[in-house]
Each structure stands twice: as C-alpha cells, then as structure tokens.
C-alpha cells in the first residue's frame, strides 16, 4: 500500500518479496462474534497494507463496519470493538492465547476470494538511487535467502534466534517460515498487481528496477 502511494518515486526489486500462498498466520482479524455480525473493527496504525487488504476482503463479504484506529492491544481493542486486526508477533501471540476467538487469516481469505497469492511486503528503492548499489543490496538479500533455504544449520539458527527475540515457540516459527514465501514467482507478482489495483486503486503496472 505504501508503494502504491509513492509509486512515482519508487521501483520494485525483482524476485524477492514477502508473500503467502494461503495461510500467513501473522495477519489476522480476531472477533468476539461471527464475522457476518461485526459492526466495528479496531485497526492498528502499523500496517497500511493489512488495513487496505482487510477493508477489501470485508467489502467482498458485503460488510461495512466502522473502522477505528487504536493501539495494537487485543484486550483494549476488543473492549471497544467487535473485532480487531493484529499483525506480526501480536497476531501469533493472540492466536495461541485466545483459541476461542473467531479468526480470519487474511492471506487465506485473499486466496479464497481471488485465487492468487498475497504479497504483504515488497523491497523497493528510490528511482534516483544508484543502480549499482541497488544491485549489490539485492544480491546480498538473495544470498541470505539462498543460505536460509539450503543450509539446514543456518535455518535452525535463524529460527532459534528469532524465537528468543520474539518469544514465539521454535516449532511455530518453523511453520511460519513455511507460510511466508520470500522468493516470488510470476504468480506472486500477478497477485501483487491484483492487490494494488483492487485494494489500493493503482491503475498503472508496478515498475521493476530491471
């Protein structure tokens, strides 16, 4: 969503992004009541993409609740609203701690509605940046991704460190890193184009750095 807003000044780096091809696990709508009955949604202020996606998906369900921006705390949000959107570690924590709440996984719902992967994050650079520096950074990212994909010991160490930093169980993070895709293909890019057009109102094609 931020890319769509600043598209004239940015281009996308190819091959890498943050995508899901079904469940994403870390972008969730939580509700005290059935989704078809919700009238208010608490929104965090830290993810424009997830907010745009949620509004699009609820619109596809013919729902038009009141949206209220507030701090990303589940208890506070559900005191004031029927439902709330959480992302990242907060979503993973809440899913584990409150299994009885109604949950909507936005990656899975996007897949159900469109049949496409959902790209939650992109790697972008300013159009006036040095192309050599961009290519160098892009190569470093791809090298790290390749190591994570192919080196089991490195992967386990990354998951272990991530578990300590996030307080998420290693087993859950192992699952999470399977739900989130970083090496994207043409189908992921097709999903990105659809999201930018349908949820963000971006009519032009996204521009790649090369």
Residue ranges of predicted features:
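Glycine/small-residue-rich interface belts in oligomeric ring/scaffold proteins
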Residues: 1-31
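Short glycine-/acidic-enriched loop or helix-start segments at secondary-structure transitions
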Residues: 5-9, 52-53, 95-96
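Active-site regions of enzymes building and remodeling cell-envelope glycoconjugates
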Residues: 9-17, 65, 99-105
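Short coil/turn segments
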Residues: 18-21, 32-34, 43-50, 115, ...
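Bilobed "Venus flytrap"/periplasmic-binding protein-like clamshell domains
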Residues: 25-82, 87-89, 190
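Pocket-lining segment of extracytoplasmic ligand-binding domains
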Residues: 70-159
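Secondary-structure end/capping motifs
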Residues: 129-198
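Conserved C-terminal helix/tail region of periplasmic/extracytoplasmic solute-binding proteins
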Residues: 202-210
